[in-house]
UniProtKB/Swiss-Prot annotation:
GO terms for biological process: arginine biosynthetic process via ornithine; L-arginine biosynthetic process. Pathway: Amino-acid biosynthesis; L-arginine biosynthesis; N(2)-acetyl-L-ornithine from L-glutamate: step 2/4. This is Acetylglutamate kinase. It comes from Serratia proteamaculans (strain 568). It catalyses: N-acetyl-L-glutamate + ATP = N-acetyl-L-glutamyl 5-phosphate + ADP.
Length: 257
């Protein structure tokens, strides 16, 4: 089976219960299946907390975090440091052989500045699959933060959904975006099982899909188009359903290419 990229988001990193559930599901899945898995993560909540402690402003533009030069070191520390090693610690606790990486390791993702107005925010494009294929072939679980580095050595904060898409393209992998919500919800708060670009545009125009979810849906649509295959948005809260999800059963919203 082709590899599966699991992108973790939301308050997952803040919740011990959620991490316990997730890694228990990952462990049991890996024992029963040969499918190579890759975890990609951001850590927005962690960064927000840190900014608050340091009395630094949090500014978002169209759902993307503005990252000034004087904040990129702090954000790199939170994402590539604390968030990455926290996930690594959970993997080790569950006897999973994991490796903590960033987008730049092995040139897995090519990163360029996205927009000068956003500061150190990067645009992710597929890179070389060599390092990750070597690790997956040896049975490791790569845990990859959404910090990238440009060709001229600038640290960049990359939207984790977009980072996961670029990695999926690099590896020819399937992609699941795991978040706090059980998928995309309609105006009545009901889960939408399948979503096309046309349906998404309608819901965005009607103001039903807003803020960070717009970025998530657009990232999933972009991923589905780029990869030429469906992408799932689902919740980590339903831990009992995660093994089925890892096997290709939709439990949230399936975004169609």
């Amino acid at each position: 089976m082709n590899p599966l990229i699991i992108k973790l988001g939301g308050v997952l990193l803040d919740s011990e219960e959620a991490l316990e559930r997730l890694f228990t599901a990952l462990d049991s899945y890996r024992q029963q299946h040969q499918r190579p898995l890759v975890i990609v993560h951001g850590g927005g909540c962690l960064v927000d907390e840190l900014m608050k402690k340091l009395s630094l402003p949090v500014v978002k533009k169209n759902g993307l975090r503005v990252t000034p030069a004087d904040q990129i070191d702090i954000i790199t520390g939170a994402l590539a440091g604390t968030a990455n090693k926290t996930l690594l610690a959970w993997a080790i606790k569950h006897q999973i052989n994991a490796v903590g990486l960033s987008l730049a390791d092995g040139g897995s993702v090519t990163v360029t500045p996205l927009d000068p107005a956003l500061g150190h925010v990067g645009n992710a494009q597929p890179g070389s699959p060599l390092l990750l294929n070597t690790l997956l072939g040896a049975g490791y679980l790569p845990v990859i933060s959404s910090i990238g580095i440009t060709a001229d050595g600038q640290l960049m904060n990359v939207n984790a959904d977009q980072a996961a898409t670029a990695l999926a393209a690099t590896l020819g992998a399937d992609l699941i975006l795991l978040s706090d919500v059980s998928g995309i919800l309609d105006g009545k708060g009901q889960r939408i099982a399948e979503m096309t670009a046309q349906k998404a545009e309608q819901l965005i125009a009607q103001g039903i899909i807003t803020d960070g979810m717009v970025v998530k849906v657009n990232a999933a649509l972009d991923a589905a188009r780029t990869l030429g295959r469906p992408v799932d948005i689902a919740s980590w809260r339903h831990a009992d359903q995660l093994p089925a999800l890892f096997n290709g059963v939709s439990i949230g919203t399936r975004i169609l290419a």
